[in-house]
Structure formats: structure tokens, C-alpha cells
Amino acid sequence: MTITISRIHALEILDSRGNPTLQVGVTLSDGSFAQAGVPSGASTGSREALELRDGDAQRYLGKGVQKALANVKNHFAPALIGKPIYDLAALDRIMLAQDGTDFKTHLGANAILGVSLALARAKGASLKKPLYAVLCPQEEYTLPVPMMNIINGGEHADNSVDIQEFMIVPAGFDRFSEALRAGSEIFHTLKKVLKEQGLNTAVGDEGGFAPDLPSNEAAFAVIMQAIERAGYRAGEQIFLAMDAAASEFYREGRYHLASEQKAYTSAEFVDYLADLCRRYPIVSIEDGLHESDWDGWQLLTQSLGERVQLVGDDLFVTNSAILQEGIDKGVANAILIKPNQIGSLSETLQTIALADAAHYAAIISHRSGETEDTTIADIAVATTATQIKTGSLCRSDRVAKYNRLLTIEDELGTRARYAAKAAFLGKIKA
């Protein structure tokens, strides 16, 4: 019996920042039902697919998503109801054709993605299989290394720190559950260290602490203290990573670090980052330069690419065409994967496959405005992405993804392995 789509319903819900977003539910002809929530970013790349907002200042301060909801109801539901559920990519193509634009500016990436993810989940419900097994049926699966954002700055926090994310990377363990435990213990130890220094322990959008610090380097220093006090070995069990989000402090050809009252040329900022990497066990730098500073990116890649993971987020925006441009120019060596940057599940998977073919690491990522949806955890397990960014060890919208990965590891048993240091393609010595 062919299982078909019988109902698609969209609802305006709130994300973790209290802003509206879409939740889409799909019902199939066999009675199976699933739903998905759509995340939203704060620090966004200029070439991301369009997140359609209403712009009505009298409602949710202009951030409502009734237009996107209407597009689900009036465009996608009529086009998809009655179609077989089996070929998810074909269903995505129907929606993409209806939109007809490169950046989903007609019907909205949030509308398309909500339906795309809900369709995939509904297929899993019908087959009585977890989403990761629907996306990639195989005998063994790899659990990703988490990149845990424990100090927030930049656009993710109201503090004096320029760099947006300071992360711990527990790559020196045998199981995901062990890595998660280490991250949790370091997070709570960091809170104690900050309190002892009279610093703020309020958290930012992604659950990390947001203290006022005298410099960006001071964030690494206090994290190193927390790692040691928690009983772990930095550079062996726990590594560091950062998301500079450099596009946010790039003006008139210079990188302006307000907390340090300094401005750098591209070459000088590459030297600044290289110096940090010499003094701290930093294994990954995301968006180290402005998204349009391709010459600077080439310099950064030449300087650090052999020993540090250089991740393009705003640079590549999960877009396979832009990633291919970067591959051709020898820029970066990894890509951040955010499904809502491109706007459909099938295009997300296509970009991950391209990265893998080019030997670029792929890191699945949340957004700063999240929901309880855990789809990205399943995508990380199903694909060749060996790392995941889903925030700190705080806030249920972040922890939900970690708990989903714990559940997957438990149900797979001996069929699961942890990516560990191998996730970084030789950047960490085993």
C-alpha cells in the first residue's frame, strides 16, 4: 500500500528568544504524524536563504510569521497532499519549484524547511524508524563530537566580549556520553570560577555564560582554569574552539575589537588568531574573517589550515554552490551546516555530501533562536558530519539535542562509535 501525505498544518509558535517561528505538522494516510520546528539566527550571513517575516510592527514587533504560515497552507499543502511520502528529495523539489528563487525570497526558507523536516519525520513515523535510520540506513553510526559554547559574546550576549562563542571540545573520550559528562562538569566548574572572580554568571542566547571580561583572550584563560579544576587535561581530553563571527566587527577594511580598543588589517588579524592558537589548545576557528574577505581567508588557510580546523559559516551559508567556490579557491577546510541557511533538508544533505567529497569537515549546527526540535542530532548521526554545535550545557532548547544524542547512543549500543579526535581530520594527534 502506498503511503501518501494527507494533511499539512502550520502553527506559529515561539522560539527560545520569545520570537515567533513555524511549527509544521504532517499527517500521512496510514495515520502517522510528526512535526518539526524551525530555528532562527541572530548573526546571519548576507547570502542566507530568506527567513520570511511579516513586517507588521503592530504584531510581535514585526517578527510574526503569518505570511510563511499562509504559504504552507496555500502553496505547499495543496501541492503535496496526495503525494507518496517515500522520495523526500522529490517532495522538496516541488516546493523549491513553487518558490522559484535562489534564496527562497518568494515563499520563505522557514516555510519550506518546516515542511521539509516534518515530511522526513513523518516518513520515519510511518516506517517506525528513527530519523537517522531513515536518512541513512546502515549497520554502524558515528556520534558527533560536541562543540560546547560555554562563554557567549558578540551578537549572542550583552557584554564586552567581541568574539561570539568560546567553546570546549571534548574529543579525547571513547563515548559521546563520557564527552557530555565532561562538558557538563566543566560548565558547572566554570560557573564557580566566574563567581569567585566576581563575574556575572547570567547566560546568553545559547546557554553559555556572558561575563564582562577585559579581553577576548581572558575568556580562554578562565575556561582553561575551569578545565583544570574539573579534573580534565586540556590539549589531551578537552580542546578549545571559537566562533569569531568576524563579519560582525568588520568595518571599513578593519577588524575592530572594541574590548581591546584595537583595529586589525586582515593580515594582522590572521596573526592575532595564530598567536592565540600557539598559546591555547585551539582546534577550530569559525568565521575567523569577514564573509567577503576571500583574500584574507586564503591567507588564514595558508597560515593555519594544516593544524587548525577553519570553519566557514557566514562564508558558505550551507550553500553548495558557494562551498564549491571556496573549495576551488582553497579557502577554509570545514563548513558549518545550518539547515535554515539553505532552507530544505535535501539541499542540506547535498552540501554535506559535497564537503565530504572535498575532504572538508562538516559541523551540524543549531541557531541562537531554537525550539525543542532535535532534528539536527539525527542529521549529525546519519551523515558524514562528525561534529555538532548545539550550545551550552544549559537551557532545555540546547540540552534537548544532547539528550537526543544520548538516546541514540543508548539504542544503538555496540553499533555506535564516537568520532573523537578523528573528527578533526588529522588536526588533533591521536
UniProtKB/Swiss-Prot annotation:
(2R)-2-phosphoglycerate binds at Q164, K338, R367, S368, K389. Its EC number is 4.2.1.11. Gene3D superfamilies: Enolase-like C-terminal domain (3.20.20.120), Enolase-like, N-terminal domain (3.30.390.10). GO terms for molecular function: magnesium ion binding; phosphopyruvate hydratase activity. Disulfide bonds: none annotated. Keywords: Cytoplasm, Glycolysis, Lyase, Magnesium, Metal-binding, Secreted. It is an enzyme of class 4 (lyase). It is found in: Cytoplasm; Secreted; Cell surface. The keyword Mitochondrion does not apply. The keyword Lyase applies. One of its GO terms (biological process) is glycolytic process. Binds a second Mg(2+) ion via substrate during catalysis. Pathway: Carbohydrate degradation; glycolysis; pyruvate from D-glyceraldehyde 3-phosphate: step 4/5. The active site is at E206, K338. PROSITE patterns: ENOLASE. Its main location: cytoplasm. Signal peptide: none annotated. Its cofactor is Mg(2+). PANTHER family: ENOLASE. Catalyzes the reversible conversion of 2-phosphoglycerate (2-PG) into phosphoenolpyruvate (PEP). It is essential for the degradation of carbohydrates via glycolysis. HAMAP family: Enolase. Belongs to the enolase family. This is Enolase. It comes from Dichelobacter nodosus (strain VCS1703A). The gene is eno.
